[in-house]
UniProtKB/Swiss-Prot annotation:
Organism lineage string: Bacteria, Bacillati, Bacillota, Bacilli, Bacillales
CoA carboxyltransferase N-terminal domain segment(s): 29-285
UniProt keyword Cytoplasm, yes or no: yes
Function, as annotated: Component of the acetyl coenzyme A carboxylase (ACC) complex. Biotin carboxylase (BC) catalyzes the carboxylation of biotin on its carrier protein (BCCP) and then the CO(2) group is transferred by the transcarboxylase to acetyl-CoA to form malonyl-CoA.
Organism: Staphylococcus epidermidis (strain ATCC 12228 / FDA PCI 1200)
Subcellular location: Cytoplasm
Name recorded for this polypeptide: Acetyl-coenzyme A carboxylase carboxyl transferase subunit beta
GO process terms (BP): fatty acid biosynthetic process; malonyl-CoA biosynthetic process
Length: 285
């Protein structure tokens, strides 16, 4: 009996202690700037249009937040919300990836389109959302863009398109690449009707999107420090065997070389677009 008592006393005993410093902050209440790493209240950041208070970095806006920022309250009417991608090439795992992004973002595809009013002026709008398959352009994205452009042409409306994309969607192969020409044809009809197309290029816009509808606006605008280009920086450097400038493929570089009309801080986005639409309306009338 005594022997058992002493044997028991030699066994290690553990006690679970509750962490007094347990994180009680609800998920989503704070946001970290991806550039300077400053942590900010999400609510205050949203009120500042997702622009970092510390370094002025323009953090991505969701498609609906972007539309809300540039339209009169309650004026947005969404088109083709239910359209979703098929898997024409039977690409392995594609349906699962689409489903995952749908659950994560609440979107059916990488673009939201429709009509809205800004200071009473009606216009067509399409906004790419890079959270969904990196904003890549597949058959649904191309079709939705063409439908809203054709609607604007028929109803003689100006059109604004916000690009944010990694390019053509590889899982759809040539069908994805076809959207470059398809959207350009719709834009040509819109242009031939004497209507205004504003291309607003945001970070990042690359690949087939930068080489098609994003670059052919009557007015091409962008946000500070936005990454805009076709091929990646490393690919270009290896191809030409030269070191590229530090600001290569930024909005400021493109502005300096005549490929953009203006780089606009997000706080000035609404006012700038409103002024352009008002001028266009006066000239059209």
């Amino acid at each position: 009996m005594f022997k058992d008592f002493f044997n028991r006393s030699k066994k290690k005993k553990y006690l679970t202690v509750q962490d007094s410093k347990q994180n009680d902050v609800p998920a989503g209440i704070m946001t970290k700037c991806p550039k300077c790493k400053k942590i900010m209240y999400t609510k205050e950041l949203n009120e500042n249009l997702n622009v970092c208070f510390n370094c002025d970095h323009h953090i991505a806006l969701t498609a609906y937040k972007r539309i809300e920022a540039i339209s009169d309250e309650g004026s947005f009417i969404e088109f083709d919300r239910g359209m979703t991608s098929a898997n024409p090439l039977d690409f392995p795992g594609y349906e699962e990836k689409i489903e995952k992004d749908q659950q994560k973002t609440g979107l059916n595809e990488a673009l939201v389109s429709g009509t809205a009013k800004l200071d009473g002026i009606q216009y067509g709008v399409a906004v790419m959302d890079a959270r969904f398959r990196m904003g890549s352009m597949g058959s649904v994205v191309g079709e939705k863009i063409c439908r809203i452009i054709d609607y604007c042409t028929e109803h003689r409306l100006p059109f604004i398109l916000f690009s944010a994309s990694g390019g053509a969607r590889m899982q759809e192969g040539i069908i994805s690449l076809m959207q470059m020409g398809k959207t350009s044809v719709s834009l040509k009809r819109h242009s031939d009707a004497g209507l205004l197309y504003i291309s607003y290029i945001t970070n990042p816009t690359t690949g087939g999107v930068s080489a098609s509808f994003a670059s052919v606006g009557d007015i091409n605008l962008s946000e500070p420090k936005a990454l805009i280009g076709f091929a990646g920086r490393r690919v270009i450097e290896q191809t030409i065997n030269e070191k590229l400038p530090d600001d290569f493929q930024t909005a400021e570089f493109l502005l300096e070389h005549g490929q953009l009309d203006k780089v606009i801080h997000r706080k000035d986005m609404r006012e700038t677009l409103s002024n352009i639409l008002k001028i266009h309306q006066e000239v059209s009338n």
